[in-house]
């Protein structure tokens, strides 16, 4: 059993948060606009030195995150062509064309310097997964960073065309509101009460 001291520093803090694997033709080529976004949901900066992100089991389709620090509550964008996203205010990792996201689904993992898996997700373009990110414009966006990102239901794909690289996802958790009547007082035997929630 792993102790807390043996877990990766980023474990439970840094997650794969957004995947733009098949940009719309109107946006441009996959080579220019593909990206993957990491999010640090903790309240502390995380040094990603020695870490990699990429396809599970691949020795070539990976990106090195050396010399990258992800600020608390912020993002890192890993792009096939980093120059496309050079105007972002968050770190952008240019993978010099070696990092690619398959259009028909892929298994991705974030690995620390010891080889331990920090996060992993296997996305797809069919079954329960959102369809629009497969060439329709938006990216796959994690609804809640603390949710299980291997579940299709944890992702949405009907947001902003081109995604939200380096910024909060347009997909947000549904707001649920409960209400209850704690007391009431009748004013006549024929009183009628109407309630409406908007």
Where are these regions (language model features)?
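Short edge beta-strand/loop segments characteristic of extracellular beta-sandwich folds
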Residues: 37-39, 194-198
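Serine/threonine-rich, low-complexity intrinsically disordered segments
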Residues: 3, 91, 166, 188, ...
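Activation on beta-sandwich/Ig-like modules and their edge loops
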Residues: 2-153, 158-164, 173
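Short, compositionally biased P/S/T/A/G/V-rich stretches that sit at domain boundaries
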Residues: 169-186
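Short, solvent-exposed loop/linker segments at the N-terminal edge
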Residues: 24-29, 183-192
